[in-house]
């Protein structure tokens, strides 16, 4: 399995910021998080803002937009960080991996990786499940190494 979890290590993160030249005298630039008007999304944005400020000293401005404006800003790339979500709508790794392929409506990052795209594309033509999963596994490793998105949490719902 690819390493899919990044440990919570604020001291390592601070050290990496220092290595990159950031300090009290040269603070990390203020960032904006774009999110759409929804109470749950606001709570998540507030939690991120607080955690980054407390643990890393990074100042975050929250930018709350109505749904149409939010979608438009995402589509044209008018954001630094965007709070977004995805629900796996079918039981296959491709439900998430296909999101990051270039020229797809849900890839709002602008990230492209030719090898990643070729692996996902080729995997979609293979009938042997173990061979297909091996290709998707390699694609996932590329995605994790490049990290164009930061998965922060998984929503869990219980229905009775």
Identify the role of each PLM range.
Residues 27-29, 77, 145:
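Residue-level preference for short coil/turn positions at secondary-structure junctions
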Residues 30, 66, 87:
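Residue-level "edge-of-site" marker
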Residues 6, 40, 54, 58-70, ...:
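Extracytoplasmic/peripheral linker and loop segments enriched in polar/acidic and small residues
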